[in-house]
Each structure stands twice: as C-alpha cells, then as structure tokens.
Amino acid sequence: MRDCKVQVGGFGEWIIKCDLELTFDEVMRGEIEELVEFIKSLESLLKSSSEDSFRKNVLNALISTLKTLPWTSRLEYADDEHNIIDVYPDDKNKKWIIKCNLCLFPDE
C-alpha cells in the first residue's frame, strides 16, 4: 500500500496516516517522491504551530528518522490513545516500511 495523509482536524488535532513501503531498489534509484512529499507535509505542519509540546517532539523524531534513510534501526512509538509509529527496514523482503497512525491533540 502507498498512502500518506497529513491534515489538521476540527479541534486542532494533527491527523497523520501513512502506510508506505519503499523497496531498496526504489530508494537506491532515488524514487522516493512520496516520502519526500510526506516529510514536507510534516515539516509544514510543525511550522504552522508555535506551541512547544509533546506532539511536536513526536513529529520531530519522526521527521529526523525519515530524513536519515536508509534506516538501520527501528523507530517505534505507541501510546494508550492508539497512536502508532513504526519505521523499519525489512531486510528479508528488501523494503523499508513506514506505518503511522497518529491523532495528536494540542496540549491543554
């Protein structure tokens, strides 16, 4: 699946969904347009907020990991609200996997 979406919801929440698999060959050939656009969307979201918050820290960690492709280690994040980040190399299938399902609300 190749689907990435970044938006702001009605209560100011950041809704980030990404299910993207990039093969080693695609990455080596520089065919990573979807990843580049996803990172740009995340950076734009960060710039739109002046708050200094937990959710900005989560996004910063995700962006810095995505920018260091090829990844050799796994970035995992999960919380009680069902927010998930999983970014990892799948050596067996020669792919990099990005799975995000986040709905991060502003700090109170």
Swiss-Prot record:
Keywords: Plasmid. This is Uncharacterized protein MJECL03. It comes from Methanocaldococcus jannaschii (strain ATCC 43067 / DSM 2661 / JAL-1 / JCM 10045 / NBRC 100440) (Methanococcus jannaschii).
